[in-house]
Amino acid sequence: MDILARTAHLVGWPRHFGPASGSDPKIRDAMARYVLTVFANGTLLGPAQVARHMRDQVSAHELSIAANKHTTCAKIDAASTDVINEFAKLDVAGMWGDGRVVAVDGTQVDTWANNILAESHIRYGGYGGIAYRHISDTYIALFSRFIPCGVWEAVYIIEGLLRNDSDIQPDTIHADTQGQSLPVFGLAALLGFDLLPRIRNWADLNFYRPSADAGFEHIDSLFGDNVIDWGLIDTHWPDLLRTTISISQGRLSSVTLLRRLGNNSRKNRLYRAFRELGRVIRTITLLRFLADAQLREQITAITNKAEAFHGFSAWLRFGGEVIGRNDPDYQEKIIKFNELLANCVIYSNACDITAAANALASDGHPIDTDDLATISPYITHTIRRFGDWVLDLSPPDAVPVTTLDLVPGALFPGDITS
């Protein structure tokens, strides 16, 4: 709760919350109400539990009104974008990654059984939906949404990148086997994204020859008799470009298109064109994957960050394991509240890491940047989750330093901790 209050002052993310009319919120102590709302929903404690532990400082009804009437998924995304942008200004964020790479992955979250989204998930062994997230190589979450278990996750992979309004704009996508399909490879390439998934069964996939007489020394055995139909791509190239432009300008949903492109029908000419282009891109990707050991290591490293974020966000969601309402909009908001909470904690931890590193350097201790880069901001041992909560909205004593001063006095003469 202190972390949310701190980031509310430093970042100002509560400014995005308020009535749908756009007028000033007619509630007492709006910042406090919004901080508690994010805490109640991001942790899955709910308004009643938080109000009880706050010892009548706020009622469950007041928190419910703030969550239902003053927040939407779009407003929560905007608040999270503010946090991401402030995080990106920190030097330490640049030590973790350059922001050009993103990992896309989902994790199962339990819900009640009788709702239109919930399904049984074979891989995870639970019943509910998938929290599908885009995690930057700098550890911060760029976009989240709640999707059904039964869909192919690759359908949603482009949407998160197009709806990401933050200063961190990745162009390389890493995902697992669920995060790829032939049409997705084609669409991602046309949109300027480099889709490089971790493909579990790559040995079972077809490598396509550019022409029937093309042969390759040493690796020709990887290629069968499959040949790219360049004529098909050329014929439908204007359609591919028009569709891609419509998606990039927001006139057509990438999710809607990719669902349609999942229909393997002879009459679906657009599907056949995207599939053929995807065969080209996937063949190139497979060859890059086999030839570049550093790329394989990068894919593993960034997808591990996504898995770590799932664990971190689940640790913050300590109020329960089940989303206890059947409203799909509410379920989506819970996932986004949890992302906002996690990003606030990541930003606060990154500020503390910066201050600690600068303090050690000012005391004469050598700081190895490679060692510093191994410290994850998914730090939990400094956070107290349980007990009576007291909301302190006093502004921080000082604005956190964003720059690493690992050479004592080079940037900040004198005692930086004063």
Q: What is the predicted function of each stretch?
A:
Residues 1-53:
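Structured, charged N-terminal subsegments at the starts of enzyme catalytic cores
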Residues 13-20, 44, 48, 76, ...:
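Intrinsically disordered or highly flexible coil/loop and linker segments, enriched in small
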Residues 18-22, 51, 80-82, 95-99:
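Short coil/turn segments at secondary-structure boundaries
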Residues 50, 102-107, 173-178:
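Short, conserved catalytic/metal-binding motifs centered on acidic residues
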Residues 53-94, 119-238:
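Catalytic or ion-translocation cores adjacent to nucleophile or general acid/base/metal-coordination motifs
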